[in-house]
Structure formats: structure tokens, C-alpha cells
Amino acid sequence: MNDELREAMGSAAVAAAKAVDYEGAGTVEFLLAEDGSFHFLEMNTRLQVEHPISECISGLDLVEQQIRVAAGLPLSFSQEDLTIRGHAIEARIYAEDPANGFLPATGPLAMFRPPEGPGIRLDTGVREGDEASIDFDPMLAKLVVHAADRPAAIRRMRRALQDFVLLGATTNIGFLVDVLSKDSFSAGETTTDFIEVNFPDGWHPGCLHSDEGEGMAMHAALAAGGAEHLGLHRRVSASATVDGEGGRGSPYNPFLSLRRNFP
């Protein structure tokens, strides 16, 4: 995304809203072709799930602005007032199983310890002790990072994901770490077939890179200790009978690799 493309997309989005006399918060989506042309996809008459990215790089509270407009008040800024600072990335944390076709997963959020630190933001409606169930959307949280540029934001997001301890329900955190580790992602080659191209055989926990090993081992130990404290280790026999990457012998399964700690 360069300044010229951003200006062109912004103008097209405004024109689309004006064409239907729309007033309020809205998000216009485009598909970007390799030749730099872009094509209208849809317009959502609301703030997009990824609106924290815009808030981070602009310093604006878009939810506040949405409420102001709905109340008949003017925006508190003009287009000329807007400046972009740094780069932001958002990762959706889902209760889902990337190794099983990204099917939704259920289970207790027995341990929910999000990362903290400069440039890290978490938007969530869950807390430790809640349950990921079939009654609600499987998205648990939105993890957002802000840094000076894209490479720094990628590094910050990887570290934040590695520091995210979530025990009880299967999540996509490991998959997200692997996505961020791909050279193609760093290069901005995030096409609509990114997963098929970069994970042609599907994703599994064994895809984790070696430089994550130490951090994953630390979290495995923490998870095992937390499981023992919460009594979850006594349930493992019912869920650890399947062979494969996520089953017996997996180096990323805290129950099995550290089972010597359990009675």
C-alpha cells in the first residue's frame, strides 16, 4: 500500500458512499490485482472487525466518531487532519482447529493470559474461566500490535502470539505464528490463495519453526503446571488417544510431553 493507492481507494470508497447517500460509519472493501488495479467487493454499513488497525495508525477512536455521527454531531476532525503513523497488524484469535480444516473448537478457557507490553492491544469479551461453546462465534479476541514499520510490527506480533497463553480450548495461535514466519508474508505476498500456496499439505503443529522451540517449551511447561492446578490433566486420557502431530508424542502437547509431572 503506497500513498497513491491509498488515495485512490479512499476516493473510490467516498464516491461509493455518496452514490447511495450513505451517512455513518462504513467500510468499503476492494480486491487488489497484481497490476495495481483494484475492484469493488462490498460495503459494510458498520465499522470493520479490523478497525483497531486504523485506530492505531491514526490515533482516532473510531467507535466514538461513529456514535457522534449517529447522534447527529459532526466528526471531530477533517480529512486534512489525518496522518498515518507506523504500521499495525491484527490477528483474530479463534477457538478453532487449523489442523482439522479450521473447524470451530469448544472447551473451557481454563487459562487465559494475553500478552502485554508497549504497542500491544487486546480487544476481547472473554476471560479466564469462560467456555468456548457452539452457541457463539468462535472468535475469542483480537490481538493488535503497532510498531514503527511493517517488519517491526511482524516481529512484535510473533512475540505477542508466542507469549499468549491460552489453555483449555484448541486455538489458531500456532497457525498464526507460522503465517507470520513465512517469507512471503513478510514480503507482502498475501494473496487470496496464501494458505493453499504456503501450506499445500495443510497445517499441523509440526510446522512450527525451530526458533520458536524454546518459547513453546516454556509455555508447554506453564500449561502443564496450570493444567495440574486446574485438574485438567485428569481429562487427557480421553483426548490423547489419536496418533498424529497433535496426539501422542507431539512435542507441543503439554499433557503428554510433560506427563511425568502428573500422578
Model-derived regions: residue spans:
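A long amphipathic alpha-helix within ATP-dependent nucleotide-binding catalytic cores
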Residues: 1-32, 160
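Alpha-helix N-cap/helix-initiation motif
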Residues: 2-5, 51-55
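Catalytic cores of soluble metabolic enzymes centered on carboxylation/carboxyl-transfer
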Residues: 13, 31, 52-263
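Conserved metal-phosphate-binding beta-hairpin within the catalytic cores
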Residues: 21-49
